[in-house]
């Protein structure tokens, strides 16, 4: 995992716009968001975390990751039954969303690498075509 390429620019902009953020940024100079550069993983985590507490999301995600044998990928998720995903603590809608994401990734209907070439609105529109993913995902 590494710091996102936009991190330093974002800190600078936030520091100029908000005094509280400036103090926090200066207090935590070593702190940073990290990226895995894995869109599939991140979208699964986003779907799992929707409308539940952080503690619940962490618990469900841990079970989900174990079901994937430690490697969350479209191929591994696609092999899992809906029942296995439900046993992880996922709702029927979240199971459908994650299975849909896996299938569209495998079939290349969803191409994660395109997102980096899009502006924010284009990326939001593209991602919103996926079940369980919207503007705030």
Which residue stretches match the model-derived regions?
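Short acidic alpha-helix initiation/capping motifs at coil-to-helix transition points
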Residues: 1-4, 37-40, 75-78, 118
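Alpha-helical ds-nucleic-acid-binding substructure associated with the helix-hairpin-helix region
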Residues: 52-53, 57-131
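Structural motif
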Residues: 33-41, 89-93
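Intrinsically disordered, low-complexity, charged terminal extensions of DNA damage-control enzymes
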Residues: 1-38
């Amino acid at each position: 995992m590494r710091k996102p390429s936009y991190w330093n620019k974002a800190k600078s902009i936030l520091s100029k716009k908000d005094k509280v953020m400036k103090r926090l940024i200066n207090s935590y100079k070593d702190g940073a968001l990290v990226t895995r550069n894995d869109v599939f993983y991140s979208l699964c985590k986003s779907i799992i975390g929707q409308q539940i507490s952080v503690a619940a999301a962490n618990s469900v995600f841990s079970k989900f990751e174990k079901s994937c044998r430690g490697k969350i990928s479209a191929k591994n998720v696609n092999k899992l039954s809906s029942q296995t995903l439900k046993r992880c603590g996922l709702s029927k809608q979240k199971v459908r969303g994650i299975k849909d994401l896996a299938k569209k990734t495998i079939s290349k209907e969803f191409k994660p690498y395109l997102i980096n070439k899009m502006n924010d609105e284009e990326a939001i529109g593209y991602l919103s075509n996926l079940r369980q993913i919207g503007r705030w995902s």
